[in-house]
Amino acid sequence: MKNKLTIIFFIILTIFFHHCSKSDGDKIFAKYADGQLTRSDLVDRFGGKKVNTILSSGSYLNTIQDLVYKKIIFDHHSDLIDNEYIKNDIQRISNDQKLKRVLDYLVNNYSLNDSIISFISTAELSKYTIQDIVVTHRLSYSQHKDRSKKEAHTIANRIKERIETQQITFDEAVSIYVEHPSIKLRNGILGPLRYGKLPKELNDVIWQSSPGQIIGPVETKFGYHIFRTVKRENIDDPKQQNRKKSIKKEIKGGRYGFLDEYTDLQAEQWFHAFGGEIHVDEIDTLWQIADSLGLFVTPNGISIHSLDKTNYNSPLAKINNQNLPISWFIDQAKKQGTYDKSNFVKAYFLYNTLKDMLHRYSAIMWFEKNKTIFDHKKTHRLIKIKQEDYLFDTFMKQEMEKDSTLTNSVILNRLAIQYDLEINDHLPQLN
C-alpha cells in the first residue's frame, strides 16, 4: 500500500512539474513599450540547448540585455532610424537570404552526368586551333555602338551563307568582317587552345568539331561567332590522365562553366514559368538614350539611378502580367544584393544586370511557392536575426555620428528610459 501511495505521489509530482514547466515555457525576461523578450525569442536565436547553457551561466543577464535592445530597435526602427531607405535595407536582407537558400538547394541537388565528365576528360587530351570571326553589337562585351543584337545576328548568318555558297572563302571573310585589328593581323587564328580557355558555349562546340568544319553563328558574351576548325592536336601529358575524380570536384567548384550553366538554366525556367519576357530592343534603346544625354561619367559609366533621367518609360521586361519599366528595376536595385551601387561602362553590363535581377526575383518567388522544399519558418527566423543585428548596428552608428562623445552604455540607457524597459533579473528556472 505504501509503495502504491509513493507511485501516486511521484505521478502527481511529475504532472505538477510538467504543468509548471509548460506554464513557464515562454518565460518573460524583459518588457518594454508595446513588446517583450521571452524564452521563445532566445530559442529562435540560439536554439534550445544553447539557451539552457546561457541561462545557467553567470552572464545570462548580459545576453538578455543585448537581445532586448535589438528587439526594441527592430520593433521601433521607423521611429529610431533616420534613414528613409531603411525598409529597403530590411527587404534586401530578406531577399538575399531567400536567394541563398535557393542557390544552396540547386548546388546540393546538382548531379553530374558521367558523359559530361568523360567529355571533359577526353577534351583535355587535345588542343584546337580555330579561325574565328566575331560579329559584335551594342549589348555584347566587345561593343559595336552602331549595331543592334538583331542586326549582328543577321550579319553573322549572312557571313556563314556566303562562305557555304562559296561566294567568298573563309580567309576573305576574315579580311572583310573581323573587327579587331590584332585578330585581323593573325588572320583570325586562335590557338592552339586547351579546353576551358574560351566561353563554355564555344568550348563545347569546338571540342565536338572536326578540322575543316565551319560552325556558327554561336552566341557568347563577345557577340556571334562563325569559326572554322583548323587543326586538332593530341596532348601527351601524364598529368591529364585519369582525372575523372578531380574533374568532378572542379566542376562542382565552378570550373568549366557547367554549374553556372545549370543555375542559369533553372533561373531562366522559373522566369518563363512566371510569364517572364525580356525586351532586348527596349534595353538597347534605353542605353542609347542614356549615352546620348551624356549620363556617362568617366570612369564609372552610367549609374543605375541616373537612368530615370532618360524619361524612357517603355517596359524593359514583363513578369506575372506586369510590365516593368526602368523605374521598377531602380526600385528593385535597392532591395536586391548590391545592385543599388551598379554602374555601367557598357550596354553589356546593363543588359546582364537587368537580366540577373529578373532571375533573382523569379528565384525568390519560386522559394515562396515551395513550402515543402524549404523550411520557411527556419528561414524567416534567420532573416529576423540578421535584420535585428543590422538595425542595431545602424542605430548605434547613427547615434555616435550625431554625438561622438556618446558611449554604447549611454545610448542604450537612453533607449531603456524611452521605452520603459524592465528586465527580470531573477535567474530563470530551466526547462
Protein language model regions, located:
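Sec-dependent signal peptide recognition
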Residues: 3-10
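C-terminal motif of bacterial Sec signal peptides marking the signal peptidase cleavage site
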Residues: 16-19
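Peptidyl-prolyl cis-trans isomerase
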Residues: 21-37, 43-431
